[in-house]
A protein has these predicted regions:
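Short secondary-structure boundary/capping segments
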Residues: 1, 34, 43-44, 60-62, ...
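Vicinal oxygen chelate
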Residues: 2, 5-15, 45, 62-127
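Core segments of cupin and vicinal oxygen chelate
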Residues: 11-51
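Structural preference for long, well-ordered alpha-helical segments within the folded cores
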Residues: 21-22, 83, 117
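Short, charged, low-hydrophobicity "junction" segments
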Residues: 22-28, 56-70
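Conserved beta-strand in the GNAT
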Residues: 52-55, 122-124
Length: 127
């Protein structure tokens, strides 16, 4: 068996500057140097060496649905929800109930919201 570890998420984005601003403001990620190339792809640090790569594709068609998402965990989910509310970022539970969290069968609490390109992001307290 080959052991794997998570490395990065790469997303095609229409406007890389708008997306960078969103992820820095909403998720409070830090931009880091793109060490792979001199392209216009920009990188953000998620934590523990994990990264989010934003690849500019202004003409790409981006199709999304809630089942295709990435999830981040925080021990302070309710504080994060207040942060979203202050920024007027709409969020919902899995069933699309606005301004509501969802408690899974295993007790984990989660919410969902979208970035400027329509990508779904789950934030939960599974930490």
């Amino acid at each position: 068996m080959h052991p794997f570890s998570f490395n990065h998420i790469a997303l095609s984005v229409k406007d890389v500057n708008e997306s960078i601003d969103f992820y820095k403001k909403v998720l409070q990620l830090t931009e880091i140097k793109n060490t792979a190339s001199n392209s216009k792809t920009r990188w953000l640090s998620i934590s523990e060496g994990k990264q989010l790569h934003l690849i500019p594709r202004p003409d790409a068609e981006i199709k999304t649905n809630k089942a295709v998402h990435f999830a981040l965990a925080t021990a302070s989910l309710h504080t994060f929800i207040k942060h979203l509310e202050e920024l007027k970022v709409e969020y919902s539970d899995w069933l699309d109930t606005p301004d509501k969290d969802y408690i899974r069968k295993d007790g984990i609490v989660q919410i969902y919201f979208q970035d400027p390109n329509g990508y779904w992001i789950e934030i939960n307290n599974d930490i």
